[in-house]
Amino acid sequence: MRFQIKDLLHISLLSTGIFLFVIDLFIINVSLPTIQHSLQLGNSDTQWIIILYIIGYASLLINAGNAGNHFGKKKLYLIGMAGFTLASLVCGLSTNLYMLLAGRLIQGISSGLMVPQGIALITLLFENKEKKAMALGIYGSIAGIASVIGQLLGGILPDQTWINESWRLIFLINVPIGSLACLAVYRYTPKDQVSGESPRSFMPMVTLFILLMGNIFPLIMGPELQWPLWSLLLLVTAIVLFILFIRKQRALEKMGYPSLLNFSLFNNRVFNLGLLAALAYYMVQDAYFIINSNYLQNQKHYSATMTGIAFVYQGIGYVLASIVVSKLIQRHGKTVVLFGLGIMILGLLSHLIVFNTMLLDPHQVHALFFFYGIGCGSVLPALMTLALKDLPEKLVAVGSAIYLTVQQLSICLGIAFIVGVFLHQKETTFFFWQDISSAYGYATTLSVILLLCVASLITCLPSEKIK
């Protein structure tokens, strides 16, 4: 069954949201060292540039579906796209850290509005099951391609010489894309029907955002400030308040009032194990890019462009593996995921061997990143399927939103813990690796331990095949 030109136009326009979100999630990883040098930022400042983007996005995910039903999916998609475009302009014109952080937070919040509505509009536009499946496949492919493009542009754009402070291009490039997409969606995408569903209060999401910031803030600032007493008190207080908040939401659900979460989901053992596996895995995922980008540029004297190209090989390995694994998983189930985790662990240990020299061979680096990408591509696409596969159909949408929220928050924890270890560890050699810094060695070791935890959780899942 073929798509008409107008079908491809709709898919392209409604995939622009996820394209821009993923681009800006990955483009920043390679360009962070350049931004840090240009704006004279501290180590914790660079962590906030990523974390505020992710928390802003995650804070709206759970309520996004309900908001789209009440206010209109097209309307929220346009508001999110416009907000993302304006925030990108703010980031590109930033003259100080606080202006950049404000822009990144608004980028994240805007993404939380537009990304869920984009995929919801695609499912509404294509009633035919075969066309819908093909459209969602294209949507997913665009997100995967965006991650590779983001890494490449994050390396190439900061090295441009025809403009001063060329790192600004990584944000300014979004402005024409977002502006054209807004106009085209307004003109060509049909308006969806608004349901009579009552809007949920956004206060629980605001409360959740504040509590998460209360947990993340001391984890980021504590190591840099030598853990003053206030940071420890804030962390303990935030954890206690977070537990009380969850208990309050559970009590509301039992009384029949709207709740932030559907707690019946957590009666499913497979879902719980899948969430824990995702929590550990995604702590490693984004931290890997940030650490290796920083290490290659600041310790091994790679340019941003060379670093971006190296990460393209990781992306190619990921894409190729994910295509092959989608077929193998149906026959071999969780064994494929465990095999992928083994490749990732072996890849991380190989980093310590290959990087143990002052003069890196680019071909070895490319092969190493490609190998690690194969491991990622064997694991990541199946994790969500593993977590959701035993849920009743009526709970899959809610379970997906919770899974995606945990995914984003796990990335924040990875940046706080693993990247924090890398940035704040004193520079000495790592045991008998004379040309590996202790910071890189300990961060890599922590990543390996977390991946071993993922493998342990996966082995606890039932052995039936994934459908």
Question: Regions from the language model: what does each represent?
Answer:
Residues 9-23, 28-30, 256-428, 438-464:
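12-transmembrane solute porter fold
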Residues 31-59, 99:
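Extracellular/periplasmic helix-loop-helix junction of adjacent transmembrane segments
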Residues 35-36, 67-68, 153-162, 219, ...:
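Interfacial helix-cap and linker-helix signal at transmembrane-aqueous boundaries
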Residues 38-40, 72, 93-99, 301, ...:
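Helix-breaking motifs and short loop linkers at transmembrane-helix boundaries and internal kinks
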Residues 51-65, 112-120, 312-324:
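Central cavity-lining transmembrane alpha-helices of secondary-active solute carriers
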Residues 61-72, 158, 321-335:
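Helix-to-loop junctions at the C-terminal end of transmembrane segments
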Residues 74-203:
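Helix-loop-helix hairpins in multi-pass membrane proteins, especially solute transporters
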Residues 160-276, 309-310:
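Hydrophobic transmembrane-helix bundles of small-molecule transporters
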